[in-house]
Regions:
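HhH-family (HhH-GPD) DNA N-glycosylase catalytic core used in base-excision repair
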Residues: 1-198
């Protein structure tokens, strides 16, 4: 068995083997992926992975409460930071999305509860055999995109939403020929022990 064909070099291999497709229910990590997927628009995911640590540092560990308070000085600082994608619209979107994220979390109790409602709270287990079979968007990502945009989120088109769903384990899009497919299908959530409780 071989890993998914897009994971041929670092940092993609480590990301594929340790994170991609593992269900995420931690609000901060969901917010991180929301921002990173939006930053990736028009770029390769490899580019974003290589800048991920820089993003964490530049965006205060992806703490939405802090980012939501960013002002003009922070925007200027971020535009001058070569370690991230220095796109004014994407930076403004990250700040605006932090504010909207907090509003959604207040309404639903957690961002996790809101986001996972688009897949009825459990991962969709796909059984793709070829990368050509994996869709770029689905009815669920279309619905997520519409609702996120209605609430004021930016850089959340359906293709970005589907990438977010893949990254956070809302869908298991590892090919069935990849050993991670079976591993991920048995994982409950990122960071949770798989041991049974007595």
């Amino acid at each position: 068995m071989e890993r998914c064909p897009w994971a041929t070099a670092e940092p993609n291999i480590t990301y594929h083997d340790e994170e991609w497709g593992v269900p995420v229910h931690d609000d901060r990590l969901l917010f991180e992926f929301l921002i990173l997927e939006g930053a990736q628009a028009g770029l390769s995911w490899t580019t974003i992975l290589k800048k991920r640590d820089n993003y964490r540092e530049a965006f205060d560990g992806f703490r939405p409460e802090k980012i939501a308070r960013y002002g003009a000085r922070d925007v200027k600082r971020l535009l001058g930071d070569a370690g991230i994608v220095r796109n004014r619209l994407k930076i403004a979107a990250a700040i605006g999305n932090a504010r909207t994220f907090l509003a959604v979390r207040k309404e639903f109790g957690t961002f996790d509860a809101y986001l996972w409602s688009f897949v009825a709270g459990k991962p969709i287990q796909n059984r793709w055999r070829r990368m050509a079979d994996v869709p770029a968007r689905t009815a669920q990502s279309d619905a997520m995109s519409r609702d996120l945009r209605r609430r004021g989120f930016k850089f959340v088109g359906s293709t970005i939403c589907y990438a977010l769903m893949q990254a956070t384990g809302m869908v298991n899009d590892h090919l069935v020929t990849c050993p991670r497919h079976a591993e991920v299908s048995g994982v409950r959530r990122a960071g949770e022990s798989s041991r049974r409780k007595n």
